[in-house]
């Protein structure tokens, strides 16, 4: 089964329709798989530069603070022991790599599941362009997106060369703009609606489907 989505223009008119291949937009979402891929994606974003010093790495504390016996106090060997102010940290974080290895087929399958979920709920839109003309206009882009969906979180997918479109939406709150080769499971699931330019949709379908796109 091939889904069809009307192609909208900034003027509010319908300029034909685009077919969404079932192999990309009509598969059964695997919740566990999408969770695994999103977790790995977020983990890869972590810097992992956190670092604490152990008692052996903290400066100072080389001299025994007081004699072993006869003071009535607990014996201490260094003022850099964890129980002292300014002492080392016990089992504190050290620099590490949080990235997880995720097979490409799993990443692609999770993305297909996420897009299929949005497509089934009529939350995938296709547009000819975001604004008319060659001058960026945030106001016009905001108005146009408002005619497509009332939801606040929108993922906009446009071609890398569409600077006018990118500049028009990049400052809109709740709107995230990416190119088709950057399309990923997290961004799709994090957005309420996904808006493709016809160019970007064709590029994504052509790269991931044997049939390609047809408008």
UniProtKB/Swiss-Prot annotation:
Keywords of this entry: Ribonucleoprotein, Ribosomal protein, RNA-binding, rRNA-binding
Domain of life: Bacteria
Keyword set includes Nucleotide-binding: no
GO molecular function, one term: structural constituent of ribosome
Region ranges (Disordered): 43-100
An annotated GO cellular component: ribosome
InterPro entries found in the cross-reference section: Ribosomal_uL4, Ribosomal_uL4-like, Ribosomal_uL4_dom_sf
SUPFAM superfamilies with a match to the protein in the record: Ribosomal protein L4
GO biological process, one term: translation
Pfam families, per the entry: Ribosomal_L4
Protein purpose: One of the primary rRNA binding proteins, this protein initially binds near the 5'-end of the 23S rRNA. It is important during the early stages of 50S assembly. It makes multiple contacts with different domains of the 23S rRNA in the assembled 50S subunit and ribosome.
Subunit structure: Part of the 50S ribosomal subunit.
NCBIfam families per record: rplD_bact (TIGR03953)
Similarity-based family: Belongs to the universal ribosomal protein uL4 family.
Protein name per UniProt: Large ribosomal subunit protein uL4
Species of the source: Mycolicibacterium smegmatis (strain ATCC 700084 / mc(2)155) (Mycobacterium smegmatis)
Upper taxonomic lineage: Bacteria, Bacillati, Actinomycetota, Actinomycetes, Mycobacteriales
